Amino acid sequence: MGLFDRGVQMLLTTVGAFAAFSLMTIAVGTDYWLYSRGVCKTKSVSENETSKKNEEVMTHSGLWRTCCLEGNFKGLCKQIDHFPEDADYEADTAEYFLRAVRASSIFPILSVILLFMGGLCIAASEFYKTRHNIILSAGIFFVSAGLSNIIGIIVYISANAGDPSKSDSKKNSYSYGWSFYFGALSFIIAEMVGVLAVHMFIDRHKQLRATARATDYLQASAITRIPSYRYRYQRRSRSSSRSTEPSHSRDASPVGVKGFNTLPSTEISMYTLSRDPLKAATTPTATYNSDRDNSFLQVHNCIQKDSKDSLHANTANRRTTPV
């Protein structure tokens, strides 16, 4: 991708990280996750008696507190009691565990921490652009934060639907508030930012690999254009071709030809004669020697005469031999 595309992706990642962290922080810190009808209890102590006044009104609650919206105790907030004294948890251990997780709110808090760390990684990737693993770490943090967020939302819904202190009519008369939707929106944005950050890392990794391959190709082509390298390569190719070609020195000689009739042992082959080694070593070309040539001609003529005489004798013998 081009520089403009990378800039747009980085801008979207930064804005998304800030939005996801802000939405989740607001959702965890506010008390508008659920609207339902409940009882606001107050306890007043006088000199002689303790009076309790119970009133069923519309309430809004968050992860830790419940606040009254109407009645005499409008605006009054109290801590949520996830383990009331009149409830029996021995019969259902799963419900007790669910209430414990709901009371701790560990998953929403963990989501906020992971979103914060992912935002730090995105900010660090702007200053350390050569370290591409930072943006990958940011993507992993955001994906993990989204998963932790959705687990916390599921636990909250399950705990609210299975609350035994509420009657069936009260369980059906509730609605989720804007804090709940902020948390759900934070989950969606966190997952999108995580996927985008991982995509940016993969894109940058591909560009680095393509650049490295192009550099290696240019270096290799530059080496092949060096004259000394080409000369060594040509010499090596020539030597290898010479070693693979068959030798024709023996086949070209008259002695090695199949069916060649060699001269008799009494005759001297002209091919075996060589020049004088002393003269051949001292002079580049052989000089004419009349004495040696005359003796050579005399010897050659004698050999021819002897061969003719032996030939006539053999013919006479053949004629006189009775059949």
Swiss-Prot record:
Give the matching Pfam families.
PMP22_Claudin
* Highest taxon of source: Eukaryota
Q: Which GO terms describe its cellular component?
A: AMPA glutamate receptor complex; cell surface; cerebellar mossy fiber; glutamatergic synapse; hippocampal mossy fiber to CA3 synapse; postsynaptic density membrane; Schaffer collateral - CA1 synapse; somatodendritic compartment
One of this protein's GO BP terms?
regulation of AMPA receptor activity
Membrane topology term: Multi-pass membrane protein
Residue ranges of region Disordered?
233-261
The entry's comment on post-translational modification says: Phosphorylation of Thr-321 by PKA impairs interaction with DLG1 and DLG4.
Q: In which tissues is it expressed?
A: Brain.
> Where are the Phosphothreonine modifications?
T321
* A molecular function (GO) term: ionotropic glutamate receptor binding
Residue positions where Phosphoserine is found in the record: S253
The UniProt entry's sequence similarity note says: Belongs to the PMP-22/EMP/MP20 family. CACNG subfamily.
Q: Where in the cell is it found?
A: Membrane; Synapse, Synaptosome
Q: Linked disorder? A: Defects in Cacng2 cause the stargazer (stg) phenotype. Stg mice have spike-wave seizures characteristic of absence epilepsy, with accompanying defects in the cerebellum and inner ear.
Q: Do you know which Gene3D superfamilies this protein is assigned to? A: 1.20.140.150
Modification Phosphotyrosine occurs at:
Y271
What's the reported outcome of changing T321 to D/E? Answer: No interaction with DLG1 and DLG4
Q: Which residues get glycosylated? A: N48
Transmembrane as a keyword of this entry, yes or no, is yes
Q: What does this protein do?
A: Regulates the trafficking and gating properties of AMPA-selective glutamate receptors (AMPARs). Promotes their targeting to the cell membrane and synapses and modulates their gating properties by slowing their rates of activation, deactivation and desensitization. Does not show subunit-specific AMPA receptor regulation and regulates all AMPAR subunits. Thought to stabilize the calcium channel in an inactivated (closed) state.
* UniProt keyword list: Calcium, Calcium channel, Calcium transport, Glycoprotein, Ion channel, Ion transport, Membrane, Phosphoprotein, Synapse, Synaptosome, Transmembrane, Transmembrane helix, Transport, Voltage-gated channel
Q: What is this protein called?
A: Voltage-dependent calcium channel gamma-2 subunit
